[in-house]
């Protein structure tokens, strides 16, 4: 298991550059986005590690002007509110920088979401969960990033691009991040597609 220190670095306090435009969002988070986020929270796939005070997991959808993503350290909030999301309006993978607008910052994990959206323009929704059992089970059985590559880094974004070139990730719509303890992302043309992929795998665990 990771030490606390590694976990803190991993969750990105904040090893990336953020240009945060702190103002209320003009757009409100779609109902479906809030519903799927709360469903994942109820299933403990998105949440908060109380002992080290760090949130895990997040969810995003493409929208006009960028993508809406649950903000940093919102894992313990339930039910989620529209203002717990932030709009990523710009990013630069190579220098690990993000511009976001809203009342909350985007975490470094936004970079991985940006890479998935960039890799396949038909993708409109992404869910990132933590599940130790499923993570171990699916490792190398579904498209899997290299173990030495940490989450929320330019290297991870490049790993995502590699998987889209070299694997059937477009069909499978799920990625295990070997270098991000317990981390799994699913995606699809909408949240229902991304969510059902995860629910199907979770059902097999029981």
Segments the model singles out, each with a brief description of its role:
Residues 2-206:
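Glycine-rich flexible loops
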């Amino acid at each position: 298991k990771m030490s606390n220190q590694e976990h803190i670095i991993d969750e990105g306090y904040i090893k990336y550059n953020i240009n945060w435009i702190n103002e209320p969002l003009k757009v409100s988070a779609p109902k479906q986005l809030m519903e799927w986020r709360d469903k994942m929270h109820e299933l403990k796939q998105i949440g908060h590690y109380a002992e080290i005070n760090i949130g895990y997991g997040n969810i995003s959808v493409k929208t006009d002007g960028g993508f809406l993503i649950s903000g940093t350290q919102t894992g313990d909030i339930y039910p989620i509110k529209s203002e717990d999301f932030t709009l990523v309006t710009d990013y630069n993978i190579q220098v690990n920088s993000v511009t976001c607008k809203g009342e909350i910052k985007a975490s470094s994990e936004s970079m991985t979401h940006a890479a998935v959206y960039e890799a396949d323009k038909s993708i409109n929704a992404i869910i990132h969960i933590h599940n130790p059992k499923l993570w171990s089970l699916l490792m190398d059985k579904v498209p899997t990033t290299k173990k030495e590559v940490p989450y929320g880094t330019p290297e991870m974004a490049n790993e995502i691009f590699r998987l889209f070139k070299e694997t059937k990730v477009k069909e499978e719509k799920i990625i295990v991040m070997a270098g991000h303890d317990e981390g799994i992302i699913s995606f699809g043309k909408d949240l229902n597609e991304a969510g059902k992929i995860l629910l199907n795998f979770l059902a097999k665990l029981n």
